[in-house]
């Protein structure tokens, strides 16, 4: 399927943060410079993805692609805990993450935990959940490299799962409908709608 020597390569992590949001708190609309991974650890958030909104629940991940308009709002009754990573990546496998959201499995959650641990070593904690943090002045040996490795591992696992799911599942009947909850989203979630 992928003819590239490197079908997926993480080229940098601009910033990353894990923070708890107050209900109703939201980010201003802006355009992604690179890719943006959003993972909801607890609670719920509503993500703006260009012209439509996606409700993410605990255990779900979403990717905003470069040049996509995005914003996030904390919704529900439980203050959500959200992990966000702004990164750059290339390779043909990254196409599978365009308009993608899905629930994580155990292997992917394990990678995400390792990534979150190294993010805490590399980036300063944020006071305001809407802000992305600055890098720490002193980073433990290999911290930047390990976070890149863990992110790449997570992306490879997700790309493989999406590839398997597409081969095994019939297309979502609502996928063709422009106003459907599935829209152009990952067929992985169609069964949950």
Residue ranges and their predicted role:
Residues 104, 126-192:
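Short, Lys/Arg-enriched, Trp-marked, Pro/Gly-tolerant hinge/linker segments that flank
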Residues 93-97, 165-166:
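A short acidic, helix-capping loop that chelates divalent metal ions and anchors anionic groups
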Residues 97-126:
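Aromatic/histidine-rich interaction motifs
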């Amino acid at each position: 399927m992928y003819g590239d020597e490197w079908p997926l390569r993480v080229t940098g992590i601009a910033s990353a943060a894990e923070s708890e949001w107050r209900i109703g708190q939201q980010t201003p609309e802006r355009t992604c410079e690179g890719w943006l991974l959003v993972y909801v650890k607890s609670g719920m958030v509503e993500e703006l993805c260009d012209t439509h909104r996606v409700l993410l629940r605990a255990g779900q991940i979403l990717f905003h692609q470069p040049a996509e308009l995005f914003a996030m709002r904390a919704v529900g009754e439980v203050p959500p805990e959200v992990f966000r990573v702004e990164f750059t990546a290339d390779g043909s496998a990254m196409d599978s993450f365009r308009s993608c959201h899905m629930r994580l499995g155990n292997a992917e959650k394990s990678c995400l935990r390792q990534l979150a641990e190294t993010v805490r070593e590399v980036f300063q904690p944020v006071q305001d959940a809407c802000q992305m943090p600055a890098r720490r002045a002193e980073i433990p040996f290999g911290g930047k490299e390990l976070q890149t490795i863990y992110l790449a591992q997570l992306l490879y696992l997700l790309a493989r799962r999406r590839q398997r799911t597409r081969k095994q599942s019939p297309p979502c009947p609502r996928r063709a409908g422009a106003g459907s909850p599935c829209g152009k989203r990952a067929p992985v979630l169609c069964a949950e709608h």
